[in-house]
A protein has these predicted regions:
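Short beta-strand elements of extracellular/lumenal beta-sandwich folds
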Residues: 46-62
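Intrinsically disordered, low-complexity Pro/Gly/Ser/Thr-rich segments with frequent PxxP/GP/PP motifs
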Residues: 79-121
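Short glycine/proline/serine/threonine-rich loop/turn segments at secondary-structure transition edges
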Residues: 117-132
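Enriched for extracellular/lumenal, surface-exposed ectodomains of secreted and cell-surface proteins
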Residues: 132-145
Length: 171
């Protein structure tokens, strides 16, 4: 009787070890996936909503194939503007490949937020300082081109403490 109990305990431990090993392998494969990295260029003149943003594929092995970027105006404090998703404009790929980013490549794009907020922004110039934005990238999963993956960036806010002001990652 004691041997069968010991054998059952051994089988349970073996099953748990196998499950932990499979979970570790799945986590390792998941961590190798490419994810887009976003940044903004300096705001030199004009509206903060006319800034050019940059997306980069920092993954050394896999491309971001068929990349589509959407800009999300998450919220503007003290306003009635609802969260809104808009497709990015003026996507310019560095290598001339209009379909995606190879490892180490980057592209630039703009977000048409002014169409949401309206013209002129001069009616409330602080609206950009109260805004929070993020980006949503959609691309093909490497090695499984028929499946798509989406990835949300961290939130950005207009940082006026740096000169010139720019959209930076929210602390």
């Amino acid at each position: 009787m004691a041997r069968s109990g010991l054998r059952s305990a051994r089988q349970v431990v073996l099953a748990l070890v196998i499950l932990a090993l499979l979970a570790g392998i799945a986590l390792g494969i998941w961590s190798l996936r490419p994810t887009p990295s976003y940044s903004s260029e300096d705001l030199t003149a004009g509206s903060p909503f006319d800034v050019t943003f940059r997306v980069e594929n920092k993954n050394p092995w896999f491309p971001l194939a068929n990349l589509r970027i959407s800009c999300v105006l998450a919220h503007v404090r003290a306003s009635g503007i609802p969260p809104t998703l808009i497709g990015a404009n003026n996507m310019r790929f560095a290598a001339g490949n209009g379909l995606g980013l190879e490892p180490g490549e980057f592209a630039t794009f703009t977000c048409p937020f002014r169409t949401l907020i309206g013209h002129p922004i001069n009616e409330d110039p602080a609206v950009a300082q109260r805004a929070e934005i993020y980006f949503r990238g959609e691309y093909d999963i490497p090695l499984l081109g028929s499946l798509r993956m989406s990835d949300n960036s961290v939130p950005f806010f207009l940082n006026t403490r740096v000169l010139p002001p720019r959209w930076t990652i929210k602390p």
